[in-house]
């Protein structure tokens, strides 16, 4: 089964390329570029003082092609969300529910708070700590939009995310999404 590309709301490119390499194997046409920079002028065999290294990979297939080729394997590899316990590590799980907007702000504050995407699922809430550049066009712009455009948001989705912890006071989970796909 494949996913309609138009239904992809969020796609973490780092996660997808890492999983693609793991599941399919390295892309024989991949190009790996390493860049070093620094200001200290010291570069020993094992020690770097003030030196940074950045690695980039270029594949002969697009991230969406990678995602399509591993979709079924991702479905099989990860469990559906059923329970989570703080202080026992993170879990990568499938969650299904309604994608909406959430907001954190001080009690009684009239100023706008921190807005984020939130998943409502089985009576639970999960706040997504997301990289806005991985959102489909239009989805990242909603945060700066008028409040008149932010009502009635409830998109049915299936999401693969790393659940990191539960905030007891706020009664919600916090997760880093890897994939969010609209269900219809």
What is each residue range found by the language model?
Residues 45-46, 89, 123, 171:
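Intrinsic-disorder/low-complexity loop/linker signature
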Residues 1-28, 54-117:
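Membrane pore-forming effector domains from diverse proteins
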Residues 8-9, 24, 32, 42, ...:
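Weak global preference for isoleucine
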Residues 29-57:
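Short, cationic, amphipathic peptide segments
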Residues 94-184:
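Long, helix-rich, hydrophobic modules that act as membrane-proximal anchors or helical bundle/coiled-coil regulators
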């Amino acid at each position: 089964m494949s996913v309609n590309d138009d239904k992809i709301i969020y796609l973490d490119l780092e996660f997808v390329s890492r999983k693609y390499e793991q599941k399919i194997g390295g892309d024989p046409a991949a190009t790996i570029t390493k860049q070093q920079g620094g200001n200290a002028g010291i570069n020993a065999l094992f020690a770097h003082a003030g030196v940074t290294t950045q690695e980039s990979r270029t594949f002969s297939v697009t991230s969406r092609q990678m995602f399509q080729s591993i979709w079924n394997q991702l479905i099989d590899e990860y469990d559906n969300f059923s329970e989570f316990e703080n202080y026992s590590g993170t879990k990568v799980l499938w969650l299904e529910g309604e994608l909406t907007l959430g907001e954190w702000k001080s009690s009684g504050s009239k100023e706008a708070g921190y807005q984020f995407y939130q998943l409502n699922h089985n009576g639970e809430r999960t706040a997504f700590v997301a990289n806005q550049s991985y959102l489909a066009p239009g989805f990242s712009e909603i945060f700066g939009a008028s409040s008149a455009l932010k009502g009635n948001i409830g998109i049915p989705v299936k999401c693969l995310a790393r659940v990191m912890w539960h905030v007891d006071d706020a009664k919600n989970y916090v997760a880093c999404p890897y994939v969010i796909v609209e269900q219809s």
